[in-house]
Amino acid sequence: MECALLCLCALRAAGPGPPWGPAGLGRLAKALQLCCFCCASVAVALASDSGSSGGSGLNDDYVFVVPVEVDSGGSYISHDILHHRKRRSAHGASNSLHYRVSAFGQDLHLELKPSAILSSHFRVQVLGKDGASETREPEVPQCLYQGFIRNDSSSSVAVSTCAGLSGLIRTRDNEFLISPLPQLLAQEHNYSSPAGHHPHVLYKRTAEKRVRWYQDYPGSQRTYPGHSPSHTPPASQSQEPEYSHRRWQKRHFCGRRKKYAPKPPAEDAYLRFDEYGGTGRPRRSAGKSQNGLNVETLVVADAKMVEKHGKDDVTTYILTVMNMVSSLFKDGTIGSDINIVVVSLILLEEEPEGLLINHHADQSLNSFCQWQSALVGKNGKRHDHAILLTGFDICSWKNEPCDTLGFAPISGMCSKYRSCTINEDTGLGLAFTIAHESGHNFGMVHDGEGNPCRKAEGNIMSPTLTGNNGVFSWSSCSRQYLKKFLSTPQAGCLVDEPKQTGQYKYPDKLPGQIYDADMQCKWQFGAKAKLCSLGVMKDICKSLWCHRVGHRCETKFMPAAEGTACGLSMWCRQGQCVKLGELGPRPIHGQWSAWSKWSECSRTCGGGVKFQERHCSNPKPQYGGKYCPGSSRIYKLCNINPCPENSLDFRAQQCAEYNNKPFRGWLYRWKPYTKVEEEDRCKLYCKAENFEFFFAMSGKVKDGTPCSPHRNDVCIDGICELVGCDHELGSKAVSDACGVCKGDNSTCKFYKGLYLSQHKANEYYPVVTIPAGARSIEIQELQLSSSYLAVRSLSQKYYLTGGWSIDWPGDFTFAGTTFEYQRSFNRPERLYAPGPTNETLVFEILTQGKNPGIAWKYALPKVMNVTQPATKRYHHTWRTVQSDCSVTCGGGYISIKAICLRDQHTQVNSSFCSVRTKPATEPKICNAFSCPAYWLPGEWSACSKSCAGGQQSRKIRCVQKKPFQKEEAVLHSLCPVSTPTQVQVCNSHACPPEWSPSPWSQCSKTCGRGVRRREVLCKSPAAETLPESLCSSSPRPEAQEGCVLGRCPKNNRLQWIASAWSECSATCGLGVRKRELKCVEKTLQGKLITFPERRCRNIKKPSLELEEACNQRTCPVYSMAVASWYSSPWQQCTVTCGGGVQTRSVHCMQQGRPSSSCLLHQKPPVLRACNTNFCPAPEKKDDPSCVDFFSWCHLVPQHGVCNHKFYGKQCCRSCTRKS
């Protein structure tokens, strides 16, 4: 199982002792693991007046609007915006609704349709006292809608029209919430509207709490179904988030261990073998489904949750949250089409019998998973997934409030007992918790833990709940985990075609429009919390800062909800505070790049794997576009030739790679361990030789590793893929009893018999002698007995159970094949080998009592059966068969094939017919006449524009193919009248925003090297300035560069000076010595300082010789002309400190000439270390621009968020010191 923990520790800047930081996470176990979803909460002491309620800045986060219903053309219909399906029918057959909202200087045309989130059989069931059950038609679902904003196809809308408009509106880069205007808020602003109008408040997530405060204010008259949270989470006690798994009942912790370790709970009674295979549903592959995958979801709200929001309003609230969850799973970055379908909602007024819910998340989830496993619909069908929403402040390891947000089993989806999660109600952020926990149920683990994805990239599966500038998406690792899970049989429950959904809809507004920033703070920090009023309004789109009694502003580093107001006519969209209602580019759906070349084969023999891959980058999905459908890789087998006989098994090679790597401080010799569960066949399990333990050394074996010794199937990317006897991936071809691929046993002769003789105990007795070349050998006892099967050769060499020594069951390789020896306490003994054998074998029985009877059988190819007299002589003759012509015109060939027939009608192997009488099979010419002329189009030219609609053209030719010739151009009149298209429109999608640099400024210096700057803005095609995040897909042009207007006056102290001569290049005879010119400056003290040569480029170099000959002593002359090594002087060291290298040349010389007669072991060294003294530490110069802008910056490195865009820049000095 996996728990999602949100660390709520309020860290006071002036508090004593070091604050607790977000803890690290342990490893993930194989089946049931617990995952920690952690985020540090920073509390900063700010000067605040206790009476502050948010300040005037809140006006920038919300506006008052009056929505009106319009028709599809935008024409006014009515101010009455309360809609149910019955009402809609009056306007026509269309199910769509249209509203217009004017806000922030723009008209938003909302186009809505009934939401497909709910099943047509969706019902709300209320479980009351004494188990009383009430099932009713829900009032809310008839007014739930989803849709988009007209002229902004990257937008999404999810609203309820039950009592005005309430919900979420998402544009390209902003998120808004909308809800009916609370009366108290209207009174504060002295606002009133004409009779018949229904005023609403449109606000960002930053204003959610403020609007919500007015909605929940005692005595406040609400004009929409509100949610009045009475739950105040207790202050965090700096508790460590916990990470644990249950596979072997061991405990691990997220972060540092507490002073005491909680006792692990007892074994879960319900954690039994999963029953996802017994649902009766078709087990098609979910990963290869061409349609969307549907997660039929049961949602259960406990009594505290129902009490918190009210029985009448909780349904609307839950469906609003689930609608947000649905949109997160429809995000293009997930890479699959996942539909969340709510089939039932159960509201608990009291806990039913058998269900225990309290603060203890682990125990509560155990109880809930077991309880929901017994729930079955009236039609006998079960839900695929169950979600428990609780009003308890849950804790993963004790029955007290702490920092846990959710809990879920990893890879539990579709399991009867493990497809379930528990999630703590925290407001609209609950949607992210549900998506995160359900992601674990889909087999996803945290980013950055055992995978290459980074922890703090703002993805849904990040261990810390921190968005990428307020935007959450799915990482590439999450896509891979999901893809792997969907390829398993377990995911088959998701392939069900969804039944037509009913009339139930989701709220059609952004969450931040329905619930303002104050309400979001109240959900996160308690009923008395509200938005912090001290200058953090513009940053709430990245992190929502809240203020509660105690004069502290604090955050959980979670962004305000999409659509939360962040300023005057501004709202939060995708983590940016942007202009309200700003329209963005259309979604760009991802398209695949071209396939790459085939990779290298993973093996040199024995059947490896190679692949081609492509990337979803042509273009990549943007602005809400869909991820590319299909697979990013295709595989095929390669190098299928057998490996040499004595070569090491491929799996054994991989285990042997760990022989020289210490394992827990010791070296072992490893060999493969294959007695594992079927789903673990593609993991690398190795056993230490001479020790009784094995370990999973790798999560997956190398591609091309056989899944098991006796099958053709191979492992690819950790998944066992089917391979037929024809060595084709995905092939179901099998060999017959005689090893003929796709054979029908027609070439086999079968032998079988029964051995029933009784003998004296404790002796060996022959059962059957099977000759070499036998295949499909099977020897089996008829009943359980105390006797044992044995095998030996004709020369009395025992291969199995010889010398009265009983072998354990397993695989035994001898006689050219592998025998599978099965012996169980409740089944008779059995021996099986596919063959063929390369020697004659004698199968015996070592009697230990009565012989129950032994059945044996084997097969021999008929051509080998020379000892058996033929019962019938067959007549074999050749016959020719011919194919159709290879072409219909232009000259082709008919291929002719000779086949061997038995008695003129049965085709058999060609070896039965005589080669001497085989007829000729030369191909025949056919259809040797010219083809009709046709148009041959050329390649399309490049598009004239990359976006906004361009043109491309191509040339066409009229060609004709004559017999056995290439096509040649002919008159256009010979071709058909209609011609292929020669010009077409291309790249019709809207142009994305792009960087727009302004002209360069003047150079900062009048001479020498200076700097010039320019402003670089992100602009739309209409030259409107947009947030920089919208242009992040392309490199940002440089805003600063170096410049030189002219050379500065000369430095009179610079001059060229020649260095000293080097040593002579030869120790005897004629050599060469060199020197070089250096650019130096002479100081007042007379010292010379060397500069790069470019500093003296304006000074004329002196005319000096830099190389001259040098004569050393005469080389000795040897009478016997012995070859010797001669070395040059050592060159200058490569560095002055810290350890460098000196080199020299060494030559073998004989009588002054190069020679190869020197002894190699006497050759002097050509390289040596030099200047190994330590270098002095460089002086650090502080960057004057690297400063802290806030007094609480010292907390940022303590909580590990220096890589956060906002906190890293604003607290540069603290982060630099920490590093």
UniProtKB/Swiss-Prot annotation:
Q: Where is the Peptidase M12B domain?
A: 293-498
Q: Which residues form the active site?
A: E437
Predominant cellular place of this UniProt entry's protein: secreted
Q: Which cofactor does it need?
A: Zn(2+)
What keywords were assigned to this record?
Disulfide bond, Extracellular matrix, Glycoprotein, Hydrolase, Metal-binding, Metalloprotease, Protease, Repeat, Secreted, Signal, Zinc, Zymogen
Q: What is its EC number?
A: 3.4.24.-
Domain PLAC, by residue range, is: 1182-1219
Example of a GO biological process term:
eye development
Family annotation (SUPFAM superfamilies): Metalloproteases ('zincins'), catalytic domain, TSP-1 type 1 repeat
Per the UniProt entry, what species is this protein from, by scientific name?
A: Mus musculus (Mouse)
Q: How is it modified after translation?
A: The precursor is cleaved by a furin endopeptidase. Glycosylated. Can be O-fucosylated by POFUT2 on a serine or a threonine residue found within the consensus sequence C1-X(2)-(S/T)-C2-G of the TSP type-1 repeat domains where C1 and C2 are the first and second cysteine residue of the repeat, respectively. Fucosylated repeats can then be further glycosylated by the addition of a beta-1,3-glucose residue by the glucosyltransferase, B3GALTL. Fucosylation mediates the efficient secretion of ADAMTS family members.
The encoding gene is: Adamts18
Biased composition of type Polar residues is found at 218-241
Q: Which residues form the signal peptide?
A: 1-47
Protein's name according to its UniProt entry:
A disintegrin and metalloproteinase with thrombospondin motifs 18
